[in-house]
Amino acid sequence: MGLFEMLPVSRLVHILVIYAASFAITDVMEDSFIQSRRLLLNRFIYRTGLFLVIIAACIWLAIVNTKVPEPYLDEVFHIPQAEKYLQGRWVEWDDKITTPPGLYLVSYVLVKARTWLSASAAAVNPRYSQDGVTAASLLRESNVYAVMAIAALVLRCRRFIETRHAPTNAKGPHFDSMYSIHTTVNITLFPVIFFFSGLYYTDLWSTATVLWAYENHLKRLTEQTTFWNDINTVILGVTALFMRQTNVFWVVVYFGGLESIHAIKKGAGSSSSKAVKAANIRDLAHALETYWALYAAGNIHDPPLSAASTYDVVWLVLSVAIAAVHNLPRVLRQVWPHISILGLFAGFVAWNGGVVLGDKSNHVATLHLAQMLYIWPLIAFFSAPLMLRCLVSTALYLRKLLQGHSAQPQKERSTKSSQKDWTLTCIGFIQQHTSSGLPFPLWYVSAAVATVIVHKSTIIHPFTLADNRHYMFYVFRYSILRRPEVRYLLVPFYVVCHRLCWHLLGGSSTQDGQRISFIQAPGVETVSSAPPKDTIKLKEEGRPEDGGESLSTGVLWLSATALSLITAPLVEPRYFIVPWVMWRIMVPAWRVQEPRSGEKGLLTRLRSWTQGLDLRLVLETLWFVAINLGTMYMFICRPYHWKDVDGKLMDEGRLQRFMW
């Protein structure tokens, strides 16, 4: 029996308490804001959505506590260790546990607070007593609170991101959009997150602490940093490391890298005249000197992700390196908290003799590059509804090509010209559906690199093959382990999924993208002063082509993701939670066309009320709900026993269950 089963007197009390908690998460807003019907609707949808998610998590927790009252799988290690802390045995440690004790410290605070509240309630009414509550149910409840924390932090992060992307001439405070609210609800419904809200694992609170550090980072980009904010940054970073060691890559590499870019851009001067002159320079030495001065002034090459190519990554790294060296004091002033966190982590590794705390023989850091191939199908699978527009447009384009090709009279075309036209058509299609300026041969390069990774860096951990309770066992069994050539046949699939995920993060249709000028930085005007006509047309049509991230953000996200994954020999969906959440937060919204002035009627009024509603998010919600129902059913209703070759029960006859 858990917290939400403790009050059988009235289930309505539970609902009201949880609903009130959702009000506490929402910021207090001004009266002028509340008077807006649309914003009132947004506020209601957020609270209702959060309320339903928490209710669903509570129901899931109650079902797990009823059907699986004893610790299951990794809970066998986590729950006894947490009990030791609750009993004040702080120096005892299970050598099988690899992660730091952050989860147990959070549970200690929550359980002690809950025990005090229960004792106070029982003094008033004995029916509020927590007699019969098991340690497993008590500790599992902490992850329900983690879901609430994730929801609150995701919404705040989206608010900062939208404020940063808002027009500079926008007046008044920025309030949460429908897209941010719906995105928040969907992230809490992410199947791997929602499933572990009913079990005692470290991943949810680890995600919450990373989001807390991310929210603080976004705040530092909009406010003048102070010494106390720097100290707070160190504290939040160390808190994230207390949950999971790999969080160092997000706190130091990702957030620290973004703040370095921010410090460089903040000090950039206006050099538009130099940029224009540099574009026409014929002398190589003079050109290098001009661009060096431009980069040294802080005007780095950082185009929007939607308009960037692979070549832009090279210029980005080069320009940032030059700018960082010439603006070192300013950069160090901004990122010294992250350097301090890295130093503390290095000290921990030296003291511990390694990264993991226990079971070091089974968790040896390796170079598992294939992890960076697996992440793209995983993101594409869970975020498939967000990619429907791209997939549909691609299918329609192919259909148009095929119809146009077949409509030509056969006798008007020779075999040679037909083959030539078809080849040019295919190449044109691929070029139009890659990043602007990305040459077609780079697809071959990507496929070649992926093939080498598959051949040299495919690691199958013994735990993956030995434990058929995890879905990854079946994914590997029926894919790359089925036949040796299957792993190579999956290479095009990896490449396509990568392009889809990268395209979605950019927020622009690649076939409409325009090449930007050589320099793209604050204070530097583009060489072509007139914006492309297609860009103006997109804005006039109100198409959802804006709000994407910059190239530096995408590169740093990719770097942090790679560092956090390639050091892990074991492939588990839980390891992809933080990379997916950070990616999903940055996916920009569609721009929905506003009703024309003067239009009236029920349809116009309905469009006004639902403006900002993204159909992709509705499909994403339904998709997540369907996956959650399926995994919950498999975990609860399809248990099985392990048996040896003679049919005898193994593992003392315990029931085994399917899970992520």
Curated annotation (Swiss-Prot):
The answer to whether UniProt assigns keyword Glycosyltransferase to this entry is yes
The UniProt entry lists membrane topology as: Multi-pass membrane protein
**What keywords are assigned to this protein?**
Endoplasmic reticulum, Glycosyltransferase, Membrane, Transferase, Transmembrane, Transmembrane helix
User: What are the EC numbers?
Assistant: 2.4.1.256
InterPro entries reported for this sequence = Alg10 (IPR016900)
Q: Which gene encodes it?
A: ALG10
Where does this protein have coiled-coil stretches? none
Q: Transmembrane segments in this chain: where? A: 6-26, 44-64, 135-155, 185-205, 235-255, 305-325, 338-358, 367-387, 434-454, 488-508, 551-571, 617-637
Q: Where is the composition biased (Basic and acidic residues)?
A: 534-546
Q: What is this protein called?
A: Dol-P-Glc:Glc(2)Man(9)GlcNAc(2)-PP-Dol alpha-1,2-glucosyltransferase
Q: Name one GO biological process term.
A: dolichol-linked oligosaccharide biosynthetic process
Q: What does this protein do?
A: Dol-P-Glc:Glc(2)Man(9)GlcNAc(2)-PP-Dol alpha-1,2-glucosyltransferase that operates in the biosynthetic pathway of dolichol-linked oligosaccharides, the glycan precursors employed in protein asparagine (N)-glycosylation. The assembly of dolichol-linked oligosaccharides begins on the cytosolic side of the endoplasmic reticulum membrane and finishes in its lumen. The sequential addition of sugars to dolichol pyrophosphate produces dolichol-linked oligosaccharides containing fourteen sugars, including two GlcNAcs, nine mannoses and three glucoses.
